[in-house]
Amino acid sequence: MAATLFVTCVTAVHADCLTDAQAAELLAHYVARTPAPNPVNLSDADGACTRGKFNQLLAQRMGKVVGYKAGLTNPAVQKRFNTDKPVWGKLYEGMVLPSGASVEAAFGARALYEADMLVRVKSAAINQAKTPEEVLDAIDQVIPFIELPDLMVQAPPQLNGAGVTAINVGARLGVAGTPLPVPVYRGERYALLKALADMNVSLTDGAGARLGGGKGSDILEHPLNAVVWLAGALQKEGITLQPGDLVSLGSFSALLPPKAGLSVTATYDGLPGAAPVRVTFK
C-alpha cells in the first residue's frame, strides 16, 4: 500500500512524453509562430520522446533532414537552462539561408540570434571520432554561421535541458557564410585545429558596435568536441552522421533578441580565411 502510494506521488510531479495531440499542438504553434505552452517537469527520456514526435510532424512539413544541431554546448548557456550537458535537434531543408539574407525580426515566436559555426561531414568515420583531430579528419568544410533559433514557448527562462530537447533545440533558421575548406596537409590541419580553439568570435551591428561573442574554446574546450558528443548521442538513438550532413556546433555568444532594422555580422578573428557572415532583420 505504502509502495503504491509512493509511486502515485512520484508520478504526480513527473510529466510524461507529450501526447500525439500535444505534439500536434506544438507543431501548430511552430507553424503559426505563436508561443506554445511550456513542457513541464520532463525527464531526459520524456524530452527525447517528445522531440521524436515533434520531428515526425516537422519532417512531414519540412522535408529532408540536412543535418543536426548540438545545443547547450557552452557552459554559460547550460547555466541559463539549468543543465550540465548538451542537447541535440534536427536541421531541415530550407533552414540554412545564405549570408546577407534579410529575415523578419519576428521569424519565430521567441526569436533569437547567436554566433555559431557549421561543419560538413566528409566521411562516416566521424561516428567513431573521439577527439577534435579525428573529427577534423572526417569533415571537409568549416562554415561561419549565425544561428536563428526560436525557443517557441510562453516562458523560455523556465525551460530546462529536457524542455529544450523537446522543442528540437529551437531549430528554425540560420545564415551560413562562405565555407572554409579543411586543408590537406598535416601542418595546415594542425594550425586550423589550434585556430578553432583560440579564435575570437564577435557579433557586431551595422555601425560596428560589439553585440556579443566568445572564444572558440567556450564550446566544450574545443568546438569540434561538440561533434564528438553529438555523434555519440545520435548513435544511442540509432542515428549515424552521413557524408554531406551539416552540424551546428553551438553558441559562442549569448542568445540575443533581434529587432527590425538591425544588421548583425559575425567575424572569426584568428581563423585565417574565414569570411564574416551577415544577417539583416526587417
Annotate the PLM regions:
Residues M1-C9:
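Bacterial N-terminal signal peptides
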Residues V10-A15:
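Sec/Tat signal peptide C-region and signal peptidase I cleavage site
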Residues D16-H222, A275-V277, K282:
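Catalytic-core "active-site belt" of small-molecule-metabolizing enzymes
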Residues S253-L256, G270-G273:
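Short, charged beta-turn/beta-strand-edge "cap" motif at the junction between a beta-strand
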